Amino acid sequence: MSIFSSISSLGLEACYRHHVRTSPNATAVVDGDQSMTYRELETRVNDLASILGRENIEEEEPIGILVPMGIAHVVAQAAVLRLGGSCVPMDLSFPDQRINDLLRALKTRIVLTVESEKARFAEFQTILVDSKYANLHQNGYHEDTIPAVETGRNHRTHILHTSGTTGLPKPVEIMSKGITRMAFNTQCVEFKSTDRVAQISAPSFDAALFEIWTTLARGAAIVLLPKNVVIDPVALHDSLRKYRITSILVTTALLNHVVSAIPNAFEDLDYVLTGGEAANPSVMQVILENGPPKKLVHAYGPTECTIITTYHLTTLEEVRRGQTPIGRPLDNTTVYILDDNLQPVKEGIVGELYIGGDAVARGYLGRPEANAKSFLEVSHLSKDGSPVRIYRSGDLVRMLDTGAIEFVARADNMVKIRGFRIEPAEIEGALLKSEMVQGTVVLPVHRPGKETYIVAFVIPKHDGAFSLEQLDEYLRRRLPAYMMPRLEAVASLPLTVHGKIDRVAVMKKHMEETKRAEQQVLISSNVKDAGDSVTWLRTLWTSVLGISNIDNEASFFHLGGSSLQAAALLVHIRRRFGLTLTMQQIYDSPTLLGLASVIDAGHAKSKVDHSRLGIFIADSQLAKDIPVLSKEAPDWRSPSEGKVFLTGATGFLGTYFLRELIDRPDVRSVKCLVRASDAHSARKRLLGALDKYGLGWADNLDKVTAIAGDLGKDLFGLSETEFHELALWTSVIFHVGAHVNYVQPYEKHRNTNVYGTLNCIKLATTGRTKALHYTSTAAVTGPVSHFTGADKIPEDVDLGEFQGWLPYDIGYTQSKWVSEQLIHSMIAKGLPAIVFRPGFIMGDSLRGKGNCDDFMCRVFIGSIKLGYRPILPNQSKIMIPVDFITTALLHITSNPYNFGRTFHLVPQTPEEDTDIETSWNMLKELGYDLKAVEYKDWLEILSKDKDLLTNPLLPMLPVLQEPVRKHLTRWELYEDMATYDVTNTRRSLADRGKLKSGIGLEDLRRHVEDWVARGLVPSRN
């Protein structure tokens, strides 16, 4: 009979005793300078078992183990198992009441502890597990001094507590066969008697079962490492070498922490297992590229399925693609991917993961309701129709074509908004940690015809002043923007008969109040006397935001309002009061009372604030203290380089540029900064952007790495080590990313656009100097002809000449002016850099597939929906196909002669430069004969249109309407606009051959076909 067969039938402790008999002199445990053989360990186990045995321990009796991590703790667990009991290891850092409550719930009689902790557990019978008791028997090792209770594979060896989502943690009953299944799965980990396994987990953590018992079951050595060593990457690295450790199991968070400081920390190990959270592909890539262990294992498994359920041997090829599968099940473990009806789903389809086999725990001790929910018996999954016991993991996964399983998300309450998967439970956790609320529920709201949004209903604490604004600021420091909920304070939350928050009742009330508010807004908009402005505005906010109980001092934006919803506010205010407010007025007076006072004042703010010019000029000097240590940059196209750092890769231009980059043989690798919480999410967002524009072909995507970060955060939100490593890796920087919003003020663009550019400058000047190529906008010069009468704008002109009319422009353009000035200031110091100023970027010249959120697309599509178009004479919109820009960027940046220059990426010939009137005529030829009206009449028709709230021009309306100079709007200031000089651009592209740089009739036809295919405009064929 094999060892494994014997252990499978006899149980976990029998396996340990096998090695006591066969390898007594092998090392069993190492704790600092103290080392103990299996013979010596058994002596101490017998010592303690002899004392504990006097208490007549019943089979599977729960024995509390409150002993610090160390040799004494290992002895305690082994002694309990020797007598047939169940180990209940607990964390001594827990509060006394929590520990005592949990032990009491298990009807615990005996607690093993140490002298210093004994007083904490006075209500239980305590037995001390100190070093003293080892001296009771100094007569050496005696085999089977204390007869072992033979228990078998179904013996409950441990009770571990999970951190339950509600109330008291759930006690999980772990069985012997679940642990031995792990110990003898040689495909995942194969320990030899000469191996040394690190024990770094708290004994109450399920990973400790792997560290202690798979090691002892295989006759290997446990090496205990204290917490202060584990959390110090340098100390951990030194200890791994000092103690010749061969295997370690680390959480994802710890792995990320260690690798960020020492990429090759695990190079001497045979096995590194990691799990507990979604793995970060970029971290795995760093490990595999910088001295990897022999095997890097991505492990997955809930406590209820004995720590490791599935495993995957990670490869460099996979992580470069952003993939970190959780792999395949261990031996004697079965996995099922099922739909809501518990039927298997097809390969590639997302379903919930269910687990069967020896891995599955007995259940939650004394929790029948929880067991009924999580541990199921079904017969249709077995071949012979016999019952199969499975555990419901609550995790959404899919089967890949390789046969490996990929983790997708948690199933509980998950919602997807604007491409991001959001777990309301995570938001609830953040709210509760704020100490500002005593209760909360976070719900996704789906309203017909409207975008899904998140509302957080919070019960404020009564022991102090409460402010939604403070709570909002607290969340913004901890959650990414896409997870920010709309906040609503409530006095209480309804409960079910089981005492849980009644989410259905909360949602029903919310939907009723929102619907009622919408009806009141509809009625009051057509009635002159609709009550005071505060009451009316509160009703309007309830309708627009989808929340109620709005405080007078609540900020529209802190409640979750977006610029699109702010535009809807302005429409309703104009229809109700005949008052055309500006978007800036909402940002200046965002509270209910503040905006109501603006309405009551009865006039719109149209005066340009020239004092803001000082802010722009001051910000343009932010890089003044950044030195350029070398004016030489590497040739990024050379065979030894080819490493590109790219921002904006999920934007329209960025996706096309990324596609061009990776198709070039001289580009070896591209690292893309993507706003996301982790690398896995960043990779998915990046691939989603490529798919959105039909660019998601598989070729060469292995060159691409997505880095989770944020342009506007210091050092992109990376650690100093990560930022420095990125700087050393990079050959060239292409800064294409930007926040683009035509109605938000400068302050809303400042972080991403200005500080994002500053971060790129820091990256370019950290370590070796790298060339920095910045994509600005042709609009950065503003309506120069209106103010100066100029007829041509030179490419290398000093932007300072245009600062006088900067206050008249929109916040986006102001931020680009500041950002470009930062680049020019660094060029003056010798930084190798190029500035590009593209015009309005349209779809590609082959397919016409473009960004329908951009200005000109909104104008065209919105006007077609309206049936009217504005008369705007002599307005060139310098429209260019996106593929012209990507080609020009790559060609121009390939020549160092172009460093320090600026290039206008606009139509290169007068024939290709299509003005707005010509565009309307081309649309007419394509079947869209729009009625031409004066600009102000067009605005009036648009603002009164019954379908305005669904017109793509709605978010643009404030900036289209607002008069900024002598009753002229910003768009009108661009009449008779100067032409853009293209001398630099034409010279640099002369050897590239003929490039299409404008939008003609056939180009527009392809755009229209794309709009029709997307359902944005009706067909005119």
From Swiss-Prot:
Induction / repression: Expressed during the earliest stages of maize kernel infection.
Region described as short-chain dehydrogenase/reductase (R) domain: spans on this chain: 646-888
Top-level division of the source organism's lineage: Eukaryota
InterPro entries membership: AA_adenyl_dom (IPR010071), ACP-like_sf (IPR036736), AMP-bd_C (IPR025110), AMP-bd_C_sf (IPR045851), AMP-binding_CS (IPR020845), AMP-dep_synth/lig_dom (IPR000873), Far_NAD-bd (IPR013120), NAD(P)-bd_dom_sf (IPR036291)
EC annotation from Swiss-Prot or TrEMBL: 6.3.2.-
Disruption phenotype annotation: Abolishes the production of ferriaspergillin and aspergillic acid.
Chain intervals for the UniProt region annotation (Adenylation (A) domain): 17-418
Pathway: Secondary metabolite biosynthesis
Function summary: Nonribosomal peptide synthetase; part of the gene cluster that mediates the biosynthesis of aspergillic acid, a hydroxamic acid-containing pyrazinone with aliphatic side chains that originates from leucine (Leu) and isoleucine (Ile). Aspergillic acid has antibiotic properties and was shown to be lethal to mice.
Listed NCBIfam families: AA-adenyl-dom, Thioester-redct
Family classification: Belongs to the NRP synthetase family.
Protein name listed in UniProt: Nonribosomal peptide synthetase asaC
Organism for this UniProt entry: Aspergillus flavus (strain ATCC 200026 / FGSC A1120 / IAM 13836 / NRRL 3357 / JCM 12722 / SRRC 167)
Gene designation: asaC
